[in-house]
């Protein structure tokens, strides 16, 4: 697995290519590979019958989920972990409700018919057909220390995910990430050969994502934390292979400190051209974006090496 190359940017399709095609669908990942984008980030939850599935939110999102009669769902509390995989198959996730707040963010996303939430095993089977040396699969395990009964325990989740990873023979192409560092500790203890990336988010005005980085944070497995410049060192001390921060949380100095620790920096989720150029100026190693083709075209236009 090639995480970084000097003077190159690694392009990751975020949830496939969410800006262009329905997120976390097999068609979205096929689209990446057809366009020579060989790295992606995706999300894993667990169904009631303990099948790892590819979806981001703990609950079905009414913004892009239809029932088996073709109607947008209205219930915002349908928990993935409460449904068997057969029950999940009754829902279609191939379109965005463009009237929803979420839908208005991705007005150019194409609609696809009959798109189901995939199993992790299906995505890995698809990925195994990509023979590029640059193939890199970032599996984010969705887990939370804040709310119970949304997932199995971190240990159980890790074992279920790794069962599929080991069947795929893609171990050397996979890096597992999580905001919930308890999950990464389980990977470290049970599967030390698997690379781990540590996700982080520090509160930004106007963004409704929970701050995960603070002293004795449960998201950080209660590790001590006093100031932002020590975060790369903390991650390195945990055996992390990469740091995955929110792109507005970093500075050029933080990237330099991370590189001094031999820790690649892959930022999320960068969709605007000026932010892409800023991240490249900061010398990050990888950029996760909902518009990977946009980033590829920008790199080509600016004579920036990418892989």
Q: Where are these predicted regions, by residue range?
A:
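Phosphate-group recognition and catalysis centered on beta-loop-alpha active-site segments
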Residues: 1-307
């Amino acid at each position: 697995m090639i995480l970084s190359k000097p003077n190159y940017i690694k392009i990751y399709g975020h949830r496939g290519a969410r800006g262009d095609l329905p997120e976390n669908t097999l068609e979205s990942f096929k689209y990446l590979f057809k366009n020579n984008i060989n790295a992606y980030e995706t999300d894993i939850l667990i169904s009631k019958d303990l099948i790892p599935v590819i979806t981001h939110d703990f609950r079905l999102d009414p913004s892009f989920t239809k029932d088996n009669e073709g109607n947008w769902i209205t219930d915002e509390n349908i928990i993935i972990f409460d449904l068997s995989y057969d029950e999940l198959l009754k829902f279609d996730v191939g379109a965005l409700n463009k009237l929803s707040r979420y839908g208005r963010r991705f007005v150019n996303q194409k609609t696809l018919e009959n798109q189901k939430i995939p199993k992790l095993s299906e995505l890995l089977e698809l990925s195994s057909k990509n023979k590029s040396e640059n193939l890199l699969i970032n599996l984010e395990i969705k887990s939370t220390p804040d709310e119970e009964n949304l997932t199995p325990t971190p240990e159980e989740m890790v074992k279920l995910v790794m069962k599929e990873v080991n069947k795929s023979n893609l171990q050397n192409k996979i890096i597992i990430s999580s905001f919930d560092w308890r999950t990464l500790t389980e990977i470290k203890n049970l599967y030390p050969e698997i690379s781990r990336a540590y996700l982080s988010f520090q509160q930004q005005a106007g963004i409704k994502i929970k701050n995960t980085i603070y002293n004795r944070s449960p998201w950080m497995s209660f590790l001590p934390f006093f100031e932002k410049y020590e975060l790369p060192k903390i991650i390195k001390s945990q055996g992390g292979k990469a740091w995955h921060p929110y792109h507005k949380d970093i500075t050029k100095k933080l990237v330099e400190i991370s590189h001094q620790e031999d820790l690649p920096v892959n930022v999320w989720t960068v969709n605007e051209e000026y932010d892409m150029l800023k991240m490249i100026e900061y010398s990050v190693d990888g950029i996760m974006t909902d518009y990977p083709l946009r980033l590829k075209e920008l790199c080509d236009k600016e004579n920036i090496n990418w892989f």
